[in-house]
Amino acid sequence: MAALMELRDVSMRFTRRLTIGERLAGMVGAGGETRDVRAVERVSLSVMAGETLGLVGESGCGKTTLGRIAAGILKPTGGAALIDGKPVMSGGRHPRKLTTRVQTVFQDPFASLNPRRQVGVIIAEGPITHGLIRAEAAREYVADWLGRVGLDPDFATRYPHQFSGGQRQRIAIARALAMRPDLLICDEPVASLDVSIQAQVLNLFLELRRALNLTCIFISHDLGVVRHVSDRIAIMYLGRIVELGPTRAIYVQPKHPYTQALLESVPKLRRRRGGARHDFRPIAGELPSPLAPPSGCHFHPRCPHAMERCRVETPALRPIAADQTVACHLYA
C-alpha cells in the first residue's frame, strides 16, 4: 500500500508574549518577555491510501497543529508535509493543483460555515472555483451531496443558523467531500455534539468512507471514538508521537506508559467478579506547559516507570512488534 500523505520530520514553533501572571511567576529571564511554544517536535508519519489514521492525545498535545500542517493551513518551521511526494505548501502558498486534494472538517461547524451564505452556495463555491463543475450544474451537484450526508436537498436555500449542530456538521462534511479530496482531515468533528448525535455523524462518516474509499486523518481526544473509525492510531504527547500501531494492538497491547494511562482513564462499565466496577483512573499529574516541556522524555514527570535515563535522554521511536512502534526507554 502506497503512502498518500507523508509528514517528514515536521516541527512547529510559535512565539508568544508571556502573560502578566507568567512574568510575576518569574518566567522572564534571558529569553526576555517572549517564549517559543514547541507545538510539534520532529514528527514523521505516513498515511496510506484508503486508510484512516487516528491521532489521539490530551488537549494541548499538538494534534490539531499537526493536522493543520498536513492540510497546508500552517507552514511548519521544520520538515515538510508531502502528498504523493509533492509539498503541500511551496513558498508559503498552496500549489493550485494540490489545493483540492486535502480538505478539512473542523470541530465547530457554526464557526466554519459562512452565516451569510446559503448552504447551496457554501457547498458549490469551491467546486465551481476550481473547475470541478460548471455553475449551471451546481444545483444538482449540491442536491446530490446533501442527499449523501442525509439531508433534504431543499435545505440548499437555507442558512447555517437554521440547522442543529449535527446538521451543520453534515453540511461541513458535504462541503469538504464536494471538492473530491484525496485526503480528508477531521479535527475533533464530533466533540461539540451531543452523544446521540455523535453516533449518527460517526456512522455517516463510516458509510461515506466505505462508499468513497476515503483516506483520512481523524483527530480526537476520545479513544472510544477513534477506536471505531481508525485502521491505525498514533498517540501524541506534548508535540511528539509516543506510540503508533494498528488499532487492535494499541487497545489490546498498549506499550507506552502514556497510552496505558490514557486507556485506564476511560470509565469502564464492565464489572469485576465481585460485582464492583473498574476504577476510573485519571492520568497522574498535570500536563506540563509547552512553554517549558520536561527534558528527556516529556512524560517522565507523570510516568510510574520513569528512570534517570528518561529525565536526560529523549527516546527514539522504535519498532517493537509488527507494524507497532513506541518511543520509550523500557523497550530500548
Predicted regions mapped to residue ranges:
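ABC ATPase NBD coupling module
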Residues: 31-34, 88-103, 121, 129, ...
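Conserved ABC ATPase "signature" region
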Residues: 24-28, 137-154, 207, 263-264
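P-loop NTP-binding/switch modules centered on Walker-like glycine-rich loops
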Residues: 95, 189-193, 197-275
